[in-house]
């Protein structure tokens, strides 16, 4: 049987730590004769949270809520910090399973992360990696502090996290590209562009005689504003036949955010996007 742990996302909870401890237990008897497969996907930056020494899961939860819910910080800016306050991320998971042979897989399209399978781009991906926890990353403690300052979040960051970033040493830094390469590990993307929902939507639209256009696969904005812009394009197509002639299906994809502030809310980014778009079109 394969066990399952059900942690929270995007704000991590104690179940995240529980799941990581189970992974840690698996590594205790690893030898060089073992072959270890890991599979990670979207959301693992939160789901696979295992706080570094002197940082609690409650502090990381409060920090995550402040960054993503209150301030609307994109995951690409949050993840470098996550890797520096965690026991598994930033390649540390690969260290854990040394000296086994490692095969890392991700349920994402590597090309969408700017990682086509060429050697030079592969090294660039490792150097600037922010989305694949088992892999190395060239992001530093100084980068993390700069991100927090950019978002005016330093003063609201828990002291334990501040201290780790300020006192970071080479011994506690993320795994370097050179160290990761020395492991001889392999990395594969399991889901490619043609296996996503877009081809299916395009095919269904064609059955109804409708043209289908992807406005953006990399949308990163406030969900409400993204909905307003896409709805305005739909209205323009209907009323002026620009930039497309109606009838047409307009699609967009990416990772939008909803900045909630200190208040609480119900729903998510897709509801926010759709509500804003629907009210504009109506």
For each feature predicted by the language model, list its residue ranges:
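C-terminal non-catalytic interaction/assembly regions of soluble proteins
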Residues: 1, 235-282
């Amino acid at each position: 049987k394969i066990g399952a742990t059900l942690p929270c996302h995007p704000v991590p909870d104690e179940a995240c730590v529980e799941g990581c401890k189970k992974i840690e237990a698996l590594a205790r008897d690893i030898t060089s004769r073992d072959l270890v497969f890991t599979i990670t996907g979207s959301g693992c930056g939160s789901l696979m949270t295992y706080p570094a020494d002197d940082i609690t899961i409650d502090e990381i939860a409060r920090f995550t809520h402040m960054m993503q819910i209150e301030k609307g910080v994109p995951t690409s800016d949050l993840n470098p910090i996550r890797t520096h306050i965690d026991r598994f991320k930033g390649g540390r998971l690969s260290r854990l399973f040394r000296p086994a042979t490692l095969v890392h897989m991700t349920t994402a399209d590597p090309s969408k992360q700017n990682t086509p399978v060429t050697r030079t781009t592969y090294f660039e991906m490792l150097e600037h990696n922010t989305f694949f926890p088992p892999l190395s990353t060239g992001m530093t403690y100084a980068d993390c502090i700069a991100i927090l300052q950019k978002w005016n979040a330093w003063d609201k960051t828990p002291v334990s996290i501040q201290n780790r970033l300020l006192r970071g040493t080479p011994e506690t830094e993320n795994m370097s590209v050179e160290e990761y390469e020395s492991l001889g590990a392999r990395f594969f993307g399991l889901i490619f562009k043609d296996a996503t929902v877009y081809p299916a939507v395009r095919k269904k639209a064609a059955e109804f005689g409708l043209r289908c256009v992807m406005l953006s696969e990399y949308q990163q904005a406030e969900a409400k504003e993204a909905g307003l812009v896409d709805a305005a394009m739909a209205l323009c197509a209907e009323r002026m036949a620009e930039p497309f002639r109606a009838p047409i299906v307009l699609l967009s994809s990416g990772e939008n955010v909803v900045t909630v502030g200190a208040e609480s809310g119900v729903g998510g980014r897709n509801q926010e996007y759709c509500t804003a778009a629907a009210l504009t079109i109506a």
